[in-house]
């Protein structure tokens, strides 16, 4: 009963009710204006015409244009108004202004720290053009001198994650889409409290929508009371606006600038299988011990300072000593930004698919992509590339699952192999090609990740973990789908 009441009076329910109330109010006001119907209808039709013209001139993916133009033309009275409310990126002006200029000090911070290289370090090697693109459009340089560890399950990440939190001496930076009180988050929080007492600087960013069901509205104030610097990213305002877009979907943990984690896991019990709402939960992660961790420090501080603008001298967070590590390949951490026109995550995935010579293996919880991505996957299979995609057998969102399944037949007909992870839900976000290149991070293969969210990942080339990622992708339990396919939830 208590759980039901908590659900009924949760922030998300209240927010949705307030939005619904505003919609009803708007419809009532329109009804009151029925005596001016001709004038109101003319204005709304004009608004729809302007919206369509704006979309036609806008530099965005054609499939996104079409997704808006068709309903606007079908429902011209309300279509333009809905586009005005929901068709734009809406961000705080301060954040937008800062993020547009954040890349200006990327190279300087990296190079002054003497930890990074330009992409020319791999010139002549297969992924050079991809690394060069990511350098030019994300400000991401290339790192060596880093020990890399791959984890096929969140359960595997957890012990090392806890040990590294406990070992931090100077600072801990955490940035996650979801924090949810339970064994995982409560354990992390107790460690963070102890670290604050030891004089370690602790900062936390969580996404307000991602955590809306789990923590109170002003949870960040509770964290501040413990001495943890904290902020809720892009806080929910229950007005007719795009509250579900432009979220901070990144997963970043940095300890002392020497150790960093990223991957698909959040700070909630299902990610380490302490609870099982959808069967066995599979999520992967990567640990970087060495120079590449510094880049994740920069990525965290970029976003932090876009809100608070506290740190004038980011190099003060640079590790005092650069330890020598075995050079386990080349790493290029990157982040995507919905304020930019460049869909970096989508382009990285597409380029890896187009460049593949032998195979493309993909883990993704969702598969809702544009026509260009579908064409790239189908064309790769048709030219003899072994293309395999692993998606969940048990969905976390049934509607999204059906949308994912709607792509299967078209891909199967082209020769793409589709597998469903039979033990439960796969939340890993990973793409692997040709025994030498992988990208691991927070990016789903859907348009929300590609176009609407802040995401992160790391390109890894010529590393020992490539074989581990391949083994993971080939050894998971799955059902191989074939035509004809009956798609049921």
Give the ranges of each region predicted by the language model.
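N-terminal localization/anchoring segments of enzymes in phospholipid and broader phosphate metabolism
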Residues: 1-347, 351, 355, 395, ...
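Residues at the starts of beta-strands that form the adenosine-phosphate
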Residues: 201-202, 386-388
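Short beta-strand scaffold segments in enzyme catalytic cores
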Residues: 252-253, 429-431
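Thr-Gly-centered strand-to-loop micro-motif
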Residues: 336, 363-364, 391, 421, ...
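Helical hairpin unit composed of two closely spaced alpha helices linked by a short loop
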Residues: 366-385
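Extended hydrophobic/aromatic segments used for targeting, binding, or gating
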Residues: 372-375, 389-391, 396-413
């Amino acid at each position: 009963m208590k759980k039901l009441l908590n659900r009924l009076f949760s922030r998300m329910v209240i927010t949705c009710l307030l939005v619904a109330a505003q919609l009803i109010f708007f419809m009532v006001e329109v009804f009151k204006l029925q005596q001016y119907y001709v004038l109101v209808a003319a204005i709304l039709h004009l608004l729809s015409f302007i919206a369509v013209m704006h979309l036609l001139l806008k530099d965005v993916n054609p499939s996104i244009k079409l997704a808006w133009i068709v309903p606007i033309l079908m429902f011209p009275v309300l279509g333009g108004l809905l586009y005005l409310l929901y068709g734009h990126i809406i961000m705080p002006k301060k954040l937008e202004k800062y993020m547009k200029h954040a890349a200006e000090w990327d190279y300087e911070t990296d190079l002054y720290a003497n930890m990074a290289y330009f992409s020319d370090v791999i010139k002549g090697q297969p992924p050079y053009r991809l690394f060069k693109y990511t350098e030019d459009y994300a400000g991401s340089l290339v790192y060596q001198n880093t020990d890399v560890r791959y984890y096929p399950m969140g359960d595997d990440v957890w012990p090392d994650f806890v040990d590294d939190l406990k070992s931090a001496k100077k600072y801990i930076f955490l940035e996650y889409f979801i924090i949810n009180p339970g064994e995982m988050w409560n354990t992390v929080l107790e460690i963070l409290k102890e670290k604050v007492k030891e004089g370690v600087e602790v900062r936390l960013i969580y996404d307000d929508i991602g955590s809306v069901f789990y923590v109170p509205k002003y949870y960040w104030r509770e964290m501040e009371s413990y001495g943890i610097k904290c902020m809720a990213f892009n806080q929910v305002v229950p007005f007719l606006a795009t509250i579900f877009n432009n979220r901070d979907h990144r997963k970043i943990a940095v300890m002392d600038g020497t150790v960093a984690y990223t991957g698909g896991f959040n700070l909630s019990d299902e990610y380490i299988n302490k609870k099982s709402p959808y069967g066995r939960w599979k999520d992967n992660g990567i640990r970087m011990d060495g120079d590449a961790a510094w880049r994740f420090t920069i990525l965290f501080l970029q976003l932090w300072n876009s809100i608070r603008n506290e740190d004038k001298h980011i190099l003060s967070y640079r590790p005092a000593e650069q330890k020598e590590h075995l050079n386990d390949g080349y790493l290029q951490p990157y982040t995507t930004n919905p304020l930019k026109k460049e869909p970096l995550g989508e382009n990285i995935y597409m380029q890896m698919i187009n460049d593949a010579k032998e195979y493309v293996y993909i883990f993704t919880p969702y598969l809702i992509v544009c026509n260009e991505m579908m064409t790239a996957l189908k064309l790769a299979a048709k030219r003899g590339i072994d293309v395999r995609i692993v998606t969940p057998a048990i969905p976390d969102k049934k509607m999204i699952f059906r949308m994912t399944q709607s792509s299967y037949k078209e891909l199967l007909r082209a020769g793409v192999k589709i597998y469903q992870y039979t033990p439960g839900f796969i939340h890993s976000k990973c793409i692997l090609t040709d025994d030498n290149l992988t990208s691991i991070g927070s990016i789903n293969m859907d348009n929300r990740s590609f176009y609407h969210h802040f995401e992160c990942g790391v390109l890894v080339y010529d590393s020992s973990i490539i074989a581990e990622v391949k083994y993971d992708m080939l050894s998971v339990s799955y059902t191989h789908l074939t035509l004809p396919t009956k798609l049921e939830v």
